[in-house]
């Protein structure tokens, strides 16, 4: 899932999911059910018949995430997946990401939102393109004697 959305604006949300589902090899007999499932995760069920050109920026973001989730991927690479998404939906999306992780899906998330980094199994802190620290969120906080990942970043950045 890229930070800028690569969607077909003149198709509906459903048609975008259908197209990408077929591209990912989702069997025709399972495609409708998968579309319904991912649309529910990102709260787009009621908007699937709308043209994507009529979607708000947040809706497009959620559609891109649904496209990333469709087709039982082995690896999800998500760039800022919940930016601009309301807290309750954000919680639901992370619940799904945890479920995917528990089912063996590898997930790589990039984010500037340190609260999101706290939710991951491992955190790689980058500064000027270099990894300046890498560990579990808890270990990063312990070894830097701070309470949040944001404080870890600020402390490591100083050194």
List each language-model region with its residue ranges:
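Catalytic Walker B motif of ABC-type/P-loop ATPase nucleotide-binding domains
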Residues: 76-79
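ABC ATPase "signature
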Residues: 134-135
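Conserved ABC ATPase signature
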Residues: 10, 51-55
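Hydrophobic anchor residue at the start of the ABC signature
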Residues: 65
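Conserved catalytic motifs of ABC-family nucleotide-binding domains
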Residues: 72
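Conserved ABC ATPase "signature" region
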Residues: 18, 22, 29-47
